[in-house]
Amino acid sequence: MENQSLTFVGDEEAKVRKSTKFHPSIWGDYFIQNSSLSHAEESTQRMIKRVEELKVQVKSMFKDTSDILQLMNLIDSIQMLGLDYHFENEIDKALRLINEVDDKSYGLYETSLRFRLLRQHGNHVSTDIFNKFKGDNGSFISSLNGDAKGLLSLYNASYLGTHGETILDEAKSFAKPQLISLLSELEQSLAAQVTLFLELPLHKRVKILLVRKYILIYQEGAMRNNVLLEFAKLNFNLLQSLYQEELKKISIWWYDLALAKSLSFTRDRIVECYYWVLTLYFDPQYSHSRLIYSKVISLVSIMDDIYDNYGTLEECRQLTEAIKRWKPQAIDSLPEYLKYFYLKLLKTFEEIGEELEHNEKYRMLYLQDQIKAIAVAYLEEAKWSIERHVPSLDEHLHYSLITSGCSLVPCASYVGMGEVATKEVFDWHSSFPKAVEACCAIGRILNDITSYEREQGRGDNASTVESYMKDHGTNEKDACKKLQEIVEKAWKDLNQESLNQKNISRLIIERLVNFSRSMEEIYMSNDMYTNSGTKMKGNITLVLVEAFPV
């Protein structure tokens, strides 16, 4: 729960201070002190050895599987179980075969699965393949109504649509009510999948949390492959051990930084920040990237609270000017409580830069520009709050797409990604292309829809919900519905850009898609970052605390 109040620290409007008290960290130093989290060295080495043995067996499955449907099911299972980064070459080779196959004889399940697998990997596949499932009246044929497996496959495929692909919109509207009506009749494993993806479709799900949940579903299925199941559990446990080591390092850094203690009005959420990082990339190769990224977003979270929850307008102006200068000498113009934060911000960026290779250090300049841009936009929103100004939706989005952090945060995720993050990537991102704009729209609007009542109750600046209501003279319910439509359009933009990009690596585009997925999860029912004692705690426990018994 939050406690809100307004404090007047002077007579001028610019000196009104909001005071919002967030609940303290629910984790404390758990990931620093709890030595029982990690597996013993001997146990870890046994798991690593067994994983290598199982990897050989799975590679043999690719070689020995000539049936295309079996190959598609193998790839789908491997991806859902979080094993795909072990078999990138095998999957790419298999997808080339799948792309060439004649699918005219395929049923609903096979057609939808092929479409989804190919689209997920950036292949253009025509939606005309679904026309054979429609009758003369233009609707999907009624004989499909009882095919739960096929309907679920169609439902998940429909979320990879782009603009103009109306048949996928129709497929979504057709499949969802049918799945709901069939749910009580399904066997346990399929029912669990339907429930999971009706709550949030596959394309919008965070990978590492999906993997953790899907392993439990997969082990109950009659068609499970025990080699894949054992591999998935061991692999997850090894990943979890790595994550726990990383989180211990970042937690020690956070407590040494002491910002949560000195700025007690901010959200103390380092564990949640790290979990957020995992939603963008969970592969072991990105360990260094995750440490960099965690530091950046934890500092941005503090900035957000300074501008949004505590700082007076004059203090926000002073901080913005200091950040624009980006020099230690700029602290002279800051109030005491901001001097420490400002120096820690500069020092952290300097330390990150020192960790980079010589030919990568330029990346920090792009990240600094992102910080400066978000500070300017935060200041504008602070003015709206003080003045009780409700901007038009267009004016709102001009600033709030930046303050959503959905441009800065993915940019930060590129910094430690090695050779794939070229200067061209940073130039492309800085130009605010459609893929970045779509990512920002998804994050901004989902945040506003979920947080509207809470933030209005404490006197925050107007959200996009209020701006839409003012522009169109409508109520909150209708405004949220229309804004949700904008989110769906943004997803189609992102899907389109995922297919169209030729000069930007798919690994970069995946960061934007994954960040958008994290927004869908965090704002599914409430702001799980701010109110982290709710569903967020359970998700973190699943991913970072509870290992699979093996």
From Swiss-Prot:
A Pfam short name: Terpene_synth
Motif annotated as DDXXD motif, chain positions: 304-308
Keywords of this entry: Cytoplasm, Lyase, Magnesium, Metal-binding
Domain of life from the UniProt record: Eukaryota
Cellular-component GO terms for this entry: cytoplasm
Cell location: Cytoplasm
Binding positions for Mg(2+) 2 per the UniProt entry: 304, 308
Major location (coarse): cytoplasm
Pathway where it operates: Secondary metabolite biosynthesis; terpenoid biosynthesis
Physiological role: Involved in the biosynthesis of germacrene D. Can use farnesyl diphosphate as substrate, but not geranyl diphosphate. Produces mainly (+)-germacrene D along with germacrene B and a number of minor by-products.
Family of this protein: Belongs to the terpene synthase family. Tpsa subfamily.
Record protein name field: (+)-germacrene D synthase
Gene source species: Zingiber officinale
